[in-house]
Amino acid sequence: MFTLDSIVGAHINYALDKTAHLPETITNNVSNVEITLKDYQYFVSRVFIGLKNLNSMLLFWDTGMGKTLTAVYIIKHIKELFPRWIILIFIKKSLYIDPWLNTIRAFAPDISNNIIFVYYDSSSSLDKFVNIYRSIENSLNKKNRLLIIIDEVHKLISRSVKKDNSERNFTPTYKKLIKLANYEGNKILCMSATPIYNNIDEFNNLIGLLRPNVMTFKEEYIINGKLINFKEIRDTLLGLCSYKRLIEADSFTETNYVEGYAKKNVIYHNIIMSEEQSKLFNLAEKYDYKTELGGLKTMRRLVSSFAFYDLKIKGDLNNIEYNDMIKRKLAEFSEFTKTINFSNNFIEKFKRDDLKNDILLEDINNYNILYQYSCKYIEACRIILNSRGKVLLFEPLVNFEGIASLKYYFNCFNITYVEYSSKTLKTRDIEISEYNNYENNDGKNIKVCIFSYAGSEGISFKCVNDIIILDMPWNESELKQIMGRSIRLNSHNDLPLENRYVNVHFIISYTNNRKSVDKEILDIIKDKQSKINVVFDLLKSISIESIHNIHKYIEPVESETIFDTIRKTRMREMNISNVIVKIKLYPIMYCKDYDRATILKGLLNKENNIIYNEDTAVAKLTIENNKPVFIIVDDNLIYIADDYYE
């Protein structure tokens, strides 16, 4: 490995020796139950507390690994390092009561009143932080130090990244945090299962928060799925991260059952819109391109979900007039669905996708009308009816072309459901409790939980067998968070071993001339994630766990030196133009095995059968009997390929 590793390893052992007296347990004062920390929780707590100059740490842990409890343990024992601390916790507002306040009151009630909470998704809370910032800064002296904890740090970082080269409103707060975190003796602990959310720029801002002024990370450093200056970057960031991910695969990769995590199967449903929905999609496409919504694909996304007679364009309507129009349309659709009551015979045939014979005329007519408006909702109902257990359905749209209309489809097919969204604030916690109840593990009482972005982070679902992604988010991190609501440590322990699985269903809708906004967004997500995965591999390599695994038996240092040096040493900039990587690539045409209708162009490396789009590896040839598989389309040779992730 590298020389610096052994020095950092010796410092880790110094911290472990220094904190050997800390208890492995923490007591729940509400239930009077003593909980033993997991080895990784105890390890990172001791290293973070034991090293004065290791002032920053990222907990890059899977969802459900106990980040909140670990943070509370650190808060409880940080006085081992210094007697007086101000605790400043940045969180999403929805996470204040559960898990944060409940966990603190249970395990550290004596300090619960001495913690300052700031909600980074609340303008009034941020204003409050600005007002108290000066008093916090003035109180930092020889008698007081500051511990900053940031939960779901990717959410905070994404608010600080420049948009269209313009400074975001959150940037001044971000700069204040950097100043506070790097005041002599202070510490900052950041937590996330997905520390990079949208793009590489966020990694720069994350480093700027944790270890400012040491480097500027450039996307150009990633060539052919590798970091060209890996050693320099690694040395600069060594020991910055704690890494605990039992499932390293991204959202699109299937995984087996492992260490309490359910098996994950990934299923793509490629479905065709009705002629009516296809026509409205084409109109929506023209509208998007004529307006500023083209890049966001807004109208096309709405129509891909639900297309009821016409486009719902606001135009010159004010908010009240527009909302009234939507209410009238929804009431009209609601009135129509009240007359639909599918027979049991039809539902059984619908589940098997066998609607050719022996069907009541009324059933088939009603089905055709519902399909005309939304092929996605129809497919979602089929998946739900075929599920052996409970189902989670992610739909970010809450109003007309979203949850509001989807629920009427569920009523038509006699599907029971609860809703967790911004519209159900008063009832959602009680309903989720009923959904998670042990007696509902098979979904017989409540089959589906529909949830929007309001439920994509911070809450847990138990014993779920199917997740349906009805509308794509913009990045893989959001997908990971969505799946993390139900694929969590021990989330399926109450089910028999053979039922500890989760099927993840992606519903991809196409017009009758093969246009698809879902496929466009899916490709964008995969392209961005290929670069983010390179950074995740880097974070694993710099983690205190990776270093300690190699140097756990090295002699501890006698006193701290290295982290103060690392924090103040800037990485040497690399001249990208001096780096030459020679790979011979051949232009080809190919298609994905699951979507042979979409013909793509790429560059093939014949040595490893990997296909590139510019500098990014995007696919790999399908090989059978040592030969690539191909088809002939319009006299063109089209290779068959699968998605590829390095």
UniProtKB/Swiss-Prot annotation:
A motif (DEXH box) lies at residues 151-154. Its EC number is 3.6.1.15. GO terms for biological process: DNA-templated transcription. GO terms for molecular function: ATP binding; DNA binding; ribonucleoside triphosphate phosphatase activity. One of its GO terms (cellular component) is virion component. ATP binds at residues 61-68. Residues 48-213 form the Helicase ATP-binding domain. The keyword Membrane does not apply. It is found in: Virion. Residues 377-540 form the Helicase C-terminal domain. It is an enzyme of class 3 (hydrolase). Keywords: ATP-binding, DNA-binding, Hydrolase, Nucleotide-binding, Transcription, Virion. It comes from the Viruses. InterPro entries: Helicase_ATP-bd (IPR014001), Helicase_C-like (IPR001650), NPHI_C (IPR013676), P-loop_NTPase (IPR027417), SNF2_N (IPR000330). Residues 466-532 are annotated as: Binding to the cap-specific mRNA (nucleoside-2'-O-)-methyltransferase. It catalyses: a ribonucleoside 5'-triphosphate + H2O = a ribonucleoside 5'-diphosphate + phosphate + H(+). SUPFAM superfamilies: P-loop containing nucleoside triphosphate hydrolases. Its main location: virion. Monomer. Interacts (via C-terminus) with RAP94 (via N-terminus). Interacts with the cap-specific mRNA (nucleoside-2'-O-)-methyltransferase. Belongs to the helicase family. NPH I subfamily. PANTHER family: SNF2/RAD54 HELICASE FAMILY. DNA-dependent ATPase required for providing the needed energy to achieve the termination of early transcripts. Acts in concert with the RAP94 subunit of the virion RNA polymerase and the capping enzyme/VTF to catalyze release of UUUUUNU-containing nascent RNA from the elongation complex. NPH-I must bind ssDNA in order to exhibit ATPase activity. This is Nucleoside triphosphatase I. It comes from Heliothis armigera entomopoxvirus (HaEPV). The lineage of its organism: Viruses, Varidnaviria, Bamfordvirae, Nucleocytoviricota, Pokkesviricetes.
